[in-house]
Amino acid sequence: PPRMALYLEYSTRIYSIYLKYIAPEDIFPYSIDEVFMDVTNYLHTYNMTPRELAMTMIQDVLKTTGITATAGIGTNMYLCKIAMDIVAKHIKADKDGVRIAELDEMSYRRKLWSHRPLTDFWRVGKGYAKKLEEYGLYTMGDIARCSIGKENELYNEDLLYKLFGVNAELLIDHAWGYEPCTMEMVKAYKPETNSVCSGQVLHCPYDFEKAKLVVKEMTDQMVLDLVDKKLVTDQIVLTVGYDIENLNN
């Protein structure tokens, strides 16, 4: 069962190991169990390839905590995410359970332009995929080719902007393996509004008491986040999604 306090303890321990190798300004925690790192300026210092540096940190985490890891290496943040989410999941783990996958713009196009479903890709939800499929666009390769269509053709970038507005720009970039956002930009971002959130996916139905415990632990963690960010609030929103089949048990 989810144990938020234990997850946080291990997340903190693992993050402290990363800090032995990488400065905090070059690390962006994406979730409790996932981070982005910009290691560009560290490769020469350590005289390592990106894969060697990733493996060194993963082995340190494994030795210290007993937890193995999967890593995605890319020439930008998007390709790192895709390398981990899609490519690494389809390669054989080593004896320690470690999977490391690498992508650059060209290998992304070779390996993943025909990959389906589109919802496997970062930031492509079911709504996006459905709209694209209605126009016969089923892959990232289809989207990329559509983006360079001529003005008098049905398939061109105007179609994508018609479907998604300004969001089409990022979709087109991702179709080609580009990502305009850098680590520096992410770290410098200041939201107009402040909020914190937390989520858990339960792998089996929970009774009331177990579910209440999970919600309490998540709330406690968000309170700590608020304190850390020097924020106060008078509102909390709880959203519960469920598989309707579980109601039949």
What positions do the PLM features span?
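DNA-contacting surface of Y-family translesion DNA polymerases
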Residues: 120, 128-249
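Gly/Gly-Pro- and Ser/Thr-rich, intrinsically disordered tail segments characteristic of DNA damage-repair
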Residues: 1-179, 183
